[in-house]
C-alpha cells in the first residue's frame, strides 16, 4: 500500500495535486484485516503530510491491525506522515529520506480567540500521544524538535534525516526495501494464526520485532482502537 503526495481530508484538493484519500485507504485496510489470504502488509510512504484528522484516522487503523505490518519511508514522511510511518509494527527509513516535524497549523481565516489556540493545542497533543505511543521517542524530545526556530528558514520545526530519525527512536531501523521485506516475512512467520482461539501462544519474535535491530526493539501490542 502506498501513501503518497498529500493526505486529503474532507475537502477535495486541486486536480494537479497527488493525493491519498482516506475514503479509499480505510476500507482497504478493513478488507486486508479480514482477508485471511493476506498474511502481511507493507506501507510505502512518500508524503508531504496533509489533513490531520484523515491522517490520524489512517494511522490508528494501521496501528490497530492484527495483520503484520511494516512501513518504509521513501523520500519523505513529513508532517502527519510521521504518525503514519510509526503506526506499523515495524518502521524503516531509507538513508536519503527525511521527516519534517512541526506544530499544527491551518490555512485561511481563523477566529483570533484563546479557544482557537487551545483547540490547535488539543489536536497537537493527540498527534504527540500517538507518536510517542507507537515509537521510542520521548515526549520532551519530540516537542523540542517541533518547536525549533533555527532549523527552517520561514517556519518552526525540524527536518530529521533517516539516520537522525532512527537515532532519536522515532523510526525503528535504517534500511532498504529488501530489509523491510525480510522483516515483514519474519513477522509473518512469527505471528499466530489470525481469527483463531485466543489460547494460541504468540511468538516472542512476533512481539519483539525483527532481528538485527541493534537493541532498538519496539513492542507493540496494539489494543487501541494539516499538521
Model-based region annotation:
Residues 1-82, 87-102, 106-227:
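N-terminal organellar transit peptides
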Amino acid at each position: 500500500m502506498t501513501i503518497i503526495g498529500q493526505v486529503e481530508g474532507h475537502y477535495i484538493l486541486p486536480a494537479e495535486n497527488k493525493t491519498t484519500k482516506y475514503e479509499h485507504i480505510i476500507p482497504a485496510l478493513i478488507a486486508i484485516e479480514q482477508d485471511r489470504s493476506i498474511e502481511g502488509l507493507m506501507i510505502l510512504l512518500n508524503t508531504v503530510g496533509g489533513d490531520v484528522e484523515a491522517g490520524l484516522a489512517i494511522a490508528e487503523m494501521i496501528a490497530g491491525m492484527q495483520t503484520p505490518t511494516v512501513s518504509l519511508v521513501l523520500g519523505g514522511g513529513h508532517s502527519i506522515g510521521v504518525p503514519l510511518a510509526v503506526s506499523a509494527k515495524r518502521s524503516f527509513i531509507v538513508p536519503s529520506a527525511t521527516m519534517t516535524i512541526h506544530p499544527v497549523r491551518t490555512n485561511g481565516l481563523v477566529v483570533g480567540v484563546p479557544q482557537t489556540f487551545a483547540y490547535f493545542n488539543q489536536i497537537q497533543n493527540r498527534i504527540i500521544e500517538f507518536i510517542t505511543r507507537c515509537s521510542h521517542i520521548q515526549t520532551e524530545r519530540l516537542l523540542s524538535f517541533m518547536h525549533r526556530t533555527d532549523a527552517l528558514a520561514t517556519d518552526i520545526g525540524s527536518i530529521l534525516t533517516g539516520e537522525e530519525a532512527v537515532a532519536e527512536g522515532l523510526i525503528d531501523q535504517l534500511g532498504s526495501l529488501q530489509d523491510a521485506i525480510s522483516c515483514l516475512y519474519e513477522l509473518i512467520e512469527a505471528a499466530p494464526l489470525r481469527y483463531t482461539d485466543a489460547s494460541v501462544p504468540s511468538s516472542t519474535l512476533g512481539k519483539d520485532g525483527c532481528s538485527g535491530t541493534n537493541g532498538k526493539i519496539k513492542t507493540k501490542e496494539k489494543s487501541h482502537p494539516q499538521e
